[in-house]
From Swiss-Prot:
Similarity comment: Belongs to the SIMIBI class G3E GTPase family. UreG subfamily.
Primary role: Facilitates the functional incorporation of the urease nickel metallocenter. This process requires GTP hydrolysis, probably effectuated by UreG.
Organism the protein comes from: Laribacter hongkongensis (strain HLHK9)
GO terms of molecular function: GTP binding; GTPase activity; nickel cation binding
UniProt GO BP: urea catabolic process
Protein name: Urease accessory protein UreG
Length: 211
């Protein structure tokens, strides 16, 4: 049976996790990467509905589902990921030719991580509007994620944040682990993020050459 890669995407409330998924999915599909999406919310499936609306005509609605966890966001993806595991297994059984499942956690804090029983790869998303001190606050999401995404770069001048400081501190906290600046409104960094994901997590998936 084909091994389907599972990628967890976590980060604080409002950091742009859903927007990142909505931005990278069309580019992944253009490369021939087959995608499923699972979102997590505590008491609704609002993120899933938002993704379905945004990606209408790009990804069929049945390949995007929401999990209503009813619990603390990190519990549902770390301590007891049973609801997400059930959702993943159901989706993979219905779409066995899939290459990757993107699993978005509910908004949480800098301590968020995913259970290795649930995901193979972990992307952590922070945003510039939270302040340029966030990378040096550290935490598992900052230092241990496979890729750190620093989103909403366009907001830096409005909140007095320095991208140079965030770049410096991210290098210090992460060592050789990659991080990338993105802006989902303009597309800045999104193609680079997609290729980074492919090279690190989906390297065995053939991709289409750019025409």
């Amino acid at each position: 049976m084909k091994k389907i890669t599972r990628i967890g995407i976590g980060g604080p409330v409002g950091s742009g996790k859903t927007a990142i998924i909505e931005a990278i999915t069309p580019l992944m599909l253009d490369l021939g990467i087959k995608v499923l999406i699972i979102t997590n919310d505590v008491v609704t499936t609002e993120d899933a509905r938002h993704v379905q609306r945004t990606l209408k005509g790009v990804l069929v609605e049945e390949k995007i589902i929401g999990v209503e966890t009813g619990a603390c966001p990190h519990t549902a993806v770390r301590e007891d990921p049973s609801m997400n595991l059930a959702a993943v297994e159901d989706m993979e059984s219905r779409f066995p030719d899939t290459d990757v499942v993107l699993i978005e956690s509910g908004g949480d804090n800098l301590t968020l991580t995913f259970s290795p029983a649930l995901v193979d790869f972990f992307i952590y998303v922070i945003d510039v509007a939270a302040g340029d001190k966030i990378p040096r606050k550290n935490g598992p999401g900052i230092s241990q994620s496979d890729i750190l995404v620093i989103n909403k770069t366009d907001l830096a001048p409005y909140v007095g944040a320095s991208l140079e400081v965030m770049d410096r501190d991210s290098k210090f906290m992460r060592g050789d682990k990659p991080f990338i600046f993105t802006n989902c409104k303009t597309g800045e960094g999104i193609p680079e993020l997609v290729h980074l994901i492919h090279d690190m997590a989906l390297f065995d998936v053939p991709i289409k050459e750019a025409s």
